[in-house]
């Protein structure tokens, strides 16, 4: 039996943070996806890029290696999530976990999967990360211009698209940035 690992990069961008935001993941020129919102944070975008990648590869049994320049994403999934779950999705200080709906979806998407995350320094020339960064920035720029970006080809055979990346769908998160 041959073992295969899907190698991808995921990234997010927010112009103004919060502001127009985009996310993107990249495997190859034929296999990538983007999405975003008119108003969100970079962390929401970073998390959603990974979530969409996990959902679009859920029908496969292959291992997944995700390059990511966000330590927040990597630590959330690999270190902090078990404690948050034990505490009812609360942090150690008792405060609610931010982006909890995305975190819960990530927890579900990770279940039974063999996924490894590797941190890469952003804007350091890592080919896959640079491609994901370009996609995320282009998606955020589209939202800034009030246009919905083309979602990209996605992963062959994927049956799920992340619904929160569609216009008007992200309403569950509190507005932490208004006065």
Feature-to-residue mapping (PLM):
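Alpha-helical transmembrane segments that form the membrane-embedded catalytic/substrate-binding core
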Residues: 46, 132-137
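RNase H-like nuclease fold core
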Residues: 1-48, 55-58, 62, 141-142, ...
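RNase H catalytic domain
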Residues: 7-9, 13-20, 51-131
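Acidic, His- and aromatic-enriched active-site or binding-groove loops in soluble protein domains
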Residues: 137-152
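A short, charged, Gly/Pro-tolerant segment at domain boundaries
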Residues: 150-162
């Amino acid at each position: 039996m041959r073992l295969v690992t899907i190698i991808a990069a995921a990234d997010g961008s927010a112009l103004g943070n919060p502001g127009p935001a985009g996310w993107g993941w990249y495997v190859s020129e034929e296999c990538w996806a983007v999405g975003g919102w008119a108003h969100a944070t970079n962390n929401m975008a970073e998390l959603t890029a990974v979530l969409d990648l996990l959902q679009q590869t859920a029908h496969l049994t292959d291992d997944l290696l995700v390059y990511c320049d966000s330590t927040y994403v990597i630590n959330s999934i690999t270190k902090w999530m078990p404690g948050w779950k034990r505490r009812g999705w609360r942090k150690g200080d008792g405060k609610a976990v931010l982006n909890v709906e995305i975190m819960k979806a990530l927890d579900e998407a990770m279940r039974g999967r063999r996924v490894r995350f590797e941190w890469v320094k952003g804007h350091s020339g890592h080919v896959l990360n640079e491609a994901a960064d370009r996609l995320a920035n282009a998606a955020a720029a589209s939202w800034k211009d009030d246009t919905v970006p083309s979602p990209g080809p996605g992963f062959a055979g994927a049956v799920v698209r992340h619904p929160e990346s569609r216009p008007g769908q992200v309403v569950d998160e509190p507005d932490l940035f208004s006065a």
